[in-house]
């Protein structure tokens, strides 16, 4: 570990730190004596009073970023805990955490009883992508989002032979590098125009009334994910059978309780997104100020 210290005790440590951050110097090829090179850089030093002002500003920004990051992590941990506790564990008929007024036992229904499947895009080559009036849901959209992001789509030509997705459909990834990441699900709540599904996923269309927010979070709950992961097959890459997936039993309370759970978890997700955006906005602000306040 190498340390740089201030030779003038009146200089502000926070100002100095941010000024050094703005140098953007990266040691090359395990460079051993980079500290001596780093020490020779010249940085502009304003008056002591201005250093204090600038240092205090960045200290406040850093504190605010840290605060929102902690809130963000706290809410992510809360969501993870609720996804474990708001759905019945294997072999049980009621969850550990439940809204008041609901006492009925939950049902266990196979996915194959509740809906039907369809395939993603097929019969295409690389030249067919990147242009056209239709769009397709990307693999990363399905993998990353319990509720599909309507903006994470790519262009493709309209093709009547392909299966067009509908609002309320569920998408599942069929392959992954690890068993823990296979069979990730995403529910479509909105779309514009003609939209298809990428070829590395399959679609699922419920034929019974299910609250879509509940469906999105239930399919990513710990109890359901364990069942999906158990079906993963492979060595260097793991795959999951569409037919096997349809044999999985999932927990279903009354539609009223579904709506309550789905709405609550969706609101929590929105709060997580809000704090994530605040953190990103503050980080962009800090980066912009670093570029503008140091020469």
Protein language model annotation of sequence segments:
Residues 98-121:
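Non-catalytic DNA-recognition/assembly elements of restriction-modification systems
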Residues 125-156:
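DNA target-recognition patches
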Residues 52-64, 68-71, 107, 259-271, ...:
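Extracellular/lumenal glycan-associated surfaces
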Residues 1-19, 34, 138-139, 150, ...:
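A short beta-sheet element
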Residues 1-2, 28-52, 122-125, 131, ...:
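A short glycine-rich beta-alpha junction/loop motif
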Residues 65-80, 89-91, 272-287:
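Extended intrinsically disordered, low-complexity coil regions enriched in Ser, Thr, Gly, Ala
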Residues 83, 89-100, 108:
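Charged, alpha-helix-forming regions
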């Amino acid at each position: 570990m190498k340390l740089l210290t201030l030779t003038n005790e009146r200089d502000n440590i926070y100002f100095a730190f941010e000024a050094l951050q703005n140098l953007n110097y990266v040691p090359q090829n395990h460079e051993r004596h980079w500290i001596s090179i780093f020490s020779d850089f010249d940085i502009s030093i304003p008056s002591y009073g201005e250093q204090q002002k600038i240092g205090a500003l960045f200290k406040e920004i850093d504190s605010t970023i840290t605060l929102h990051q902690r809130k963000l992590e706290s809410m992510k941990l809360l969501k993870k805990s609720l996804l474990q506790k708001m759905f019945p564990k294997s072999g049980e008929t009621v969850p550990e955490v439940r809204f008041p007024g609901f006492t009925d036992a939950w049902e266990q229904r196979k996915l194959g009883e509740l809906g039907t499947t369809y395939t993603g895009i097929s019969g295409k080559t690389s030249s067919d992508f990147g242009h056209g009036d239709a769009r397709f849901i990307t693999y990363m959209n399905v993998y990353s989002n319990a509720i599909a992001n309507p903006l994470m789509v790519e262009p493709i030509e309209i093709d009547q032979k392909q299966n067009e997705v509908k609002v309320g459909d569920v998408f599942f990834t069929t392959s992954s590098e690890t068993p823990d990441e296979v069979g990730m699900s995403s529910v479509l709540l909105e779309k514009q125009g003609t939209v298809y599904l990428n070829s590395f996923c399959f679609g699922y269309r419920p034929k019974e009334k299910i609250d879509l927010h509940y469906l999105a979070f239930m399919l990513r709950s710990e109890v359901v994910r364990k069942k999906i992961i158990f079906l993963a097959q492979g060595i260097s890459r793991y795959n999951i059978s569409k037919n096997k997936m349809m044999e999985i039993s999932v927990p279903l309370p009354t539609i009223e309780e579904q709506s309550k759970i789905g709405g609550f978890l969706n609101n929590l997700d929105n709060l997580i997104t809000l704090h994530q955006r605040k953190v990103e906005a503050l980080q962009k602000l800090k980066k912009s100020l670093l570029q503008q306040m140091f020469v």
